Amino acid sequence: MADSEDTFRLQNSPSDSEPKDLQNEGKSDKQNAAVSKSPSSQTTYIQQGMEGIKVYLHERELWTKFHEVGTEMIITKAGRRMFPSFKVKVTGLNPKTKYILLMDVVPADDHRYKFADNKWSVTGKAEPAMPGRLYVHPDSPATGAHWMRQLVSFQKLKLTNNHLDPFGHIILNSMHKYQPRIHIVKADENNGFGSKNTAFCTHVFPETAFIAVTSYQNHKITQLKIENNPFAKGFRGSDDMELHRMSRMQSTKEYPVVPRSTVRQRVGSSQSPFSGDVQGLSASGAISSQYSCENGVSSTSQDLLPQSSSYHEHTQDYHCIKRKVEDECPAGEHPYKKPYVESSSSEDDHYYRPLSYSQSLGLSGGAPYRPESSQRQACMYASAPQPPEPVPSLEDISWPGVPPYSVPQMERLPYQHHFSAHFASRQMPEAHGMYASSVSHQCSPSGGIQSPSAGLQGNEYLYAHGLQRTLSPHQYHTVHSVSIMHDWNEAS
């Protein structure tokens, strides 16, 4: 490594005020011994009135480790901070006088360097240096008591290779050697900054010299940066970066931090209930028990959701899914429950053919018909032991975005009075009202739905056994469209 001694020649030449400095150093030997880790700086220039000021480099051992290998500092177009950070301890200031602390970076020599065979060597003459910029500490101006109270940090200073940088960063050339300097200027109201009579002093630390690079050349410097800089994530593995991010966030946050990879997996696995993923909507025991005996068959909230293929292929069709009778509600406990007639098709097959009336209502053979109200009341008390809470009805998990279909004219409306009184308890969307009313028509030449009792007419058919016409609350009523379906063709 070729160091130029011309730049630091003033460091070894005594100035006019050095005898007084030597006396002060003799008096403060104990003080220097106490802070031996940060010895006094090499003083380049001291004006009259600034003689007693001492500056000590913070983390001198770390700077020495880098200096022995050959310190490198990354420069980018946007600007990059230095590491190790430039921090100093200042003593000897007048507590009541205001000072301005600033820093600049000057060329250490007139050479251009290259890194080959694991060492730096001179490769040519240096490029013309850009006009030097000064970085003024953000706390300036401040009293001497303020500067001496704590460490003075220049960690916000950034280095750039953009010669047109508009942000005030220090402009450097790559593969050139530079030396940082710190200046202490007395802020006098009578004398403006930069005038001939302004008192200031400059301090230089040779171990802070570095070579500006766009990428680290020496792998030893890279290793030192990783070991000592908690923010040097660019050369670590992805797992180390993730763990480092989590540890930093966990130390400042009270809630647990989840890795990004886990979040992506969870988001990818959980789908909306309308995309066909039944796992996206997990039903609790209380909710599933309240849907367990609707319409004479047991079902869960998952059974009421459409499969993915049918939803995407038939977005404009209402379709039914076969539901199984659960083992939790055997037919012996609930005599009104009758299973569906088994068909030869698979359980996952979606069908659009019209069912017979006995099948759609869960009746088999000549079993007596029981009204909907009695079935709902029995289901209420036969469900889970905990008191039922208001849960969304089947209309709430239907397809509200599907427009209503045109319904052909029907001859009679045997369910008209029952539905009108029942739907008066709550306001329903237009689509559901149209769909429910269309199902109430039973006799149609093209419907293909047969009535179980031709002799019973209207309300006589509904209440053939003389049961009381009790209307259950709206949260327990059932949409009759779950099991009854018109014969829709593909054209509709």
Swiss-Prot record:
GO terms for molecular function: DNA-binding transcription factor activity; DNA-binding transcription factor activity, RNA polymerase II-specific; RNA polymerase II cis-regulatory region sequence-specific DNA binding; RNA polymerase II-specific DNA-binding transcription factor binding; sequence-specific DNA binding. Coiled coil: none annotated. Residues 31-43 have a biased composition (Polar residues). It is found in: Nucleus; Cytoplasm. Residues 17-30 have a biased composition (Basic and acidic residues). Gene3D superfamilies: Transcription factor, T-box. GO terms for biological process: animal organ morphogenesis; atrial ventricular junction remodeling; atrioventricular canal development; atrioventricular valve formation; cardiac chamber morphogenesis; cardiac left ventricle formation; cardiac muscle cell differentiation; cardiac muscle tissue regeneration. One of its GO terms (cellular component) is actin cytoskeleton. Keywords: Cytoplasm, Developmental protein, DNA-binding, Nucleus, Transcription, Transcription regulation. Residues 1-43, 331-352 are annotated as: Disordered. Residues 62-237 bind DNA. The keyword Nucleus applies. The T-Box domain binds to double-stranded DNA. Monomer. Homodimer (via the T-box); binds DNA as homodimer. Required for pectoral fin formation. Together with tbx5b, involved in eye and heart development. Required for the looping stage of heart development. May bind to the core DNA motif of promoters. This is T-box transcription factor TBX5-A. It comes from Danio rerio (Zebrafish). The lineage of its organism: Eukaryota, Metazoa, Chordata, Craniata, Vertebrata.
